[in-house]
C-alpha cells in the first residue's frame, strides 16, 4: 500500500522542513490572482456556493517547489512568467462555453523533456468540491505519461485531492498540503470514498480514519 500523507497547513512552511530533491515529482495548481491588484478576484461556483481564488503565490513558493522536487508540472505557468520549453495542453472539452478557458496550460520541467503534449479529458461533473477541480483521469494520464521517472508525488495545493486519488490508484507515494480547512475536509471525504491514507494536522498529530473495506 503506498504512502498517502496530507497536511492541513501552509505548503511553503511544510516545504521548508524538507531536504533538497525530497520528491520525484511536484504537481502544482496555484491560484493566479493577486489581491494587491486593483482588479477583483475571480469568483466561481461549486454546487451553488460562491468561492474566491486565493492569492497568487510569492516567488518563495516556486523556489521551494523546485528545491524539494526533482521534476515539476505547474498548471497555469503562463500566468506566472515562468520560462518553460515543454508543456501540457489540456483540452477540457467544453465546446461553446465562454465562461472558462477551454484549454489550460501546464509547464513541465526540462528534466521531464521538452516535448509538448496535448490531452483531451472532459472536466464535466456535477459534484465538484473545489472551484479549480481537475479530473482524476487527467492526473492518471500525467502519472502514466511521466511515471517512469517517479516514485513520490507532491501536490502543494491539492484542493479536491484528485492528484492524491490518482497517485494512490497508480501505487505512488503521495504527500500533499491544503491550507483551507473546508477544502481539506471535503477532499479527505472524497479520497476516503475510494482509498485509505494518513491525515495529519499542522502539529503532526494523526487523524484516525476508517478504511472503507473494514468489516467487509
Regions found by a protein language model. Give the residues of each.
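Class I S-adenosyl-L-methionine-dependent methyltransferase catalytic core
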Residues: 1-154, 160-216
